[in-house]
Structure formats: C-alpha cells, structure tokens
From Swiss-Prot:
Keywords: Cytoplasm, Methyltransferase, S-adenosyl-L-methionine, Transferase. The gene is TNMT. Optimum temperature is 37 degrees Celsius. One of its GO terms (cellular component) is cytoplasm. This is (S)-tetrahydroprotoberberine N-methyltransferase. Coiled coil: none annotated.
Length: 358
C-alpha cells in the first residue's frame, strides 16, 4: 500500500497547524511528505511519450515568457539568512548547502563535501591560473576550495546576501588567501564587462524563470574559450514549479514561498542553447542528495538546544518563531530525503551540464 492510500484526508491548513504545534511525529510526517511527491508524479507523468513531450515543451515555452528570476528576496529572508554559527552546527566544514557526493558507504559529510567540490572542478575542467566566477556562491565553500587547490586561480563568489559575502571574505582572510573576491549583487541585475575562464552555478539556477534571458546574460561573461558548468536538482522526466500541486498540498508552499523555485527536468537546459552550446551532460543519482539532507537533519537534532539558542537573538527572542524555523528546516530535510530517495534515487536527482559560448 502506497502513501496515497494511507494518508487521511485533511486540509493543507489543518496539516500545517498540526506540524507547527509539534503534533506530527516523524513517521507520520514521512508519510505525509511522500504522499505529496506521489501526487506530483501522478501529475507529471503522462500516458504516452507524445503527451509527455508536449507537456514538457509547454513548460519550456512558459519559462520563455516570464521574468528572469523568481521571488529571490522572499526566499533569502525565509531560507538562507541564518547565522553562520547555526549553519556550522548543521552542515559540514565548508558549510555546503547543496548536494554532497558520497564516494563510499562510510564517507563522512566533510569527505562528501570535498568530493562534490572535486567533482565540480573535474567536470568544469578547472585548471591553475584561470579566472573563476561562482554564481550564487552561498557561504563560499567552493570558492575557497578552488582558491586553495589552484593557487594561481583568481576566484570570485557572487551572491545577493551580505551575510554570505562577509562570511566568505572572513574565511578567506583566516586561510591567508589573496586570490579570492566577493561580489554583492543580484545576478539578474548585475552588469559587468569582465569575462571569466570558468563560470560555475551550483544549485542556484533553480531560482531563475526565464532561462533564455539568463543563459544569454551568462554568455556575456564568457569568451570563446570559457566554459559554464551548471549543477541543478531535477526530475528525470518532467519539470515543475515547487508550488502546490492541488489545494491539499501543504508541503510545497511551506518549503519554498510560491514563485521561488523551479525544478527542471534533466534535459530542460538543452532547450536553452541560443547563446551557449552543450559540451557534456551528466546526472548524479538522487541518493547523494537524500543522504546529504538526512545527515543535516541528524546534526540539527543532535545540536538542537544549542541551535535554538543561536537563533533566538536574531528572531526577537521569540521561542515560537525559533521553533517555527527549526520545524521548517527539519521538514525541508525530511522532505528532501523522501523526494530524492524515491525509486532508489532514480526519480529526482541532480543534473550537471557543461556549456561553451556560441
């Protein structure tokens, strides 16, 4: 019996109310989340290949009519603007908030973070002496990794979060790195005549909408010899916005505010080659992501009291608000596990593509 048969009918508001009051135990929460993803699969899979192709192409065409990005400011406030001490208590040593890559069963989160950084460098063909731009760099773990490994590279991180810029520059100073820069900007608004040998975008393109315009913008920062490496979460067959699939979907809007996240199909970016052309294309099994978020949740649970104390001052001393933030993060992690472990990691996964300028 699947989750769809096991979940009792209640409104999205009722489910969220119980969740925020702490009335839903983890086992029930797993079933409730899995139910939502099973509904998403029913929504996304079509009965014939022609129907599937038409459905997918309609989505691609719809993106081309939209603004370049989604509601990034809303998402930043609700998802990414957390104290660095909190992030350090939950994530690994490079504070990587995206898929980690587990090369063996006993790999630690620190080893998996490093392996992911190494995989990016290998597939992006990073070489010493290059100029590198990491777009949506987060806390700067990849920037610092490249700057340390390739001493003659000049590595720049771009983010619209002041806290992330400050964290990155502080870590670079601690490490004695002089080949690191940070740009505080919204990538969709940022203009520059500068070009880079390598552009990297790790799990950030999900927050874009009009990918035709966005890829054109990225191409202006490339020369004929440059390469663009994009890593994004995806579904293997169809794309979808991370928004409610029906009126009873409590999960999607709770995890990301509406308009903030687009889950592409594994091949979606192949339809946006007006200004760049694909050089290589890979997928990474979803179990790497599932294992990552599961480790983050366990670290949060282990450090729960300390984590709440870290959050309290920045949230107005409100224990209720702190509990809400923690519930959101735990639910995000549990949801990520259910999503990316479906079909043994062969349903939702991570796509990686390498492009050159046309």
């Amino acid at each position: 019996m699947g989750s769809i048969d096991e979940v009792k009918k209640e409104s999205a508001g009722e489910t969220l109310g119980r969740l925020l009051k702490g009335e839903i135990k983890d086992e029930e929460l797993k079933k409730l989340i899995k139910f939502q993803f099973e509904k998403r699969l029913q929504w996304g899979y079509k009965s014939s290949h022609q129907e599937q192709l038409s459905f997918n192409l309609d989505f691609i065409k719809s993106l081309k009519k939209m603004e370049m990005s989604g509601e990034i400011e809303t998402m930043n406030k609700e998802t990414y603007e957390l104290p660095s001490e909190f992030l350090e208590a939950v994530f690994g040593k490079t504070v990587k908030q995206s898929m980690c890559y587990f090369t063996h069963e006993s790999a630690t989160i620190d080893e998996a973070e490093e392996a992911a950084h190494e995989l990016y460098c290998e597939r992006a063909q990073i070489k010493d002496g290059q100029t590198v731009l990491d777009i949506g760099c987060g806390q700067g773990g990849l920037v610092l990794y490249i700057a340390q490994k390739y001493k003659n590279c000049h590595v720049t991180g771009l983010t619209n979060s002041k806290a992330q810029v400050n964290y990155l520059l502080k870590q670079a100073e601690k490490l004695g790195l002089t080949n690191v820069d940070a740009i505080l900007a919204d990538v969709t608004q940022y203009e520059s005549d500068k070009t880079y040998d390598r552009l990297l975008m790790i799990e950030a393109i999900e927050h874009m909408k009009n990918l035709q315009l966005f890829m054109k913008k990225l191409s202006t920062w490339m020369t004929k010899e440059s390469l663009l490496f994009v890593d994004h979460v995806c579904h293997k067959t169809f794309a979808h916005f991370f928004e409610a699939v029906d009126e009873d979907d409590w999960y999607s809007g709770f995890i990301f505010p509406p308009g903030c996240a687009t889950i592409l199909a594994a091949n979606s970016l192949l339809y946006f080659q007006d200004d760049v052309s694909v050089v290589d294309h890979w997928v990474v099994n979803g179990m790497h992501m599932a294992r990552s978020v599961d480790i983050w949740r366990k670290a949060l649970d282990k450090n729960m009291e300390a984590a709440k104390e870290i959050l309290l001052p920045g949230l107005g001393g409100s224990h209720e608000t702190v509990n809400g933030v923690v519930t959101h993060i735990r639910t995000f992690c549990m949801g990520g596990y259910e999503q990316f472990s479906m079909n043994n990691g062969d349903e939702w996964m991570v796509a990686q593509l390498l492009f050159k300028k046309k």
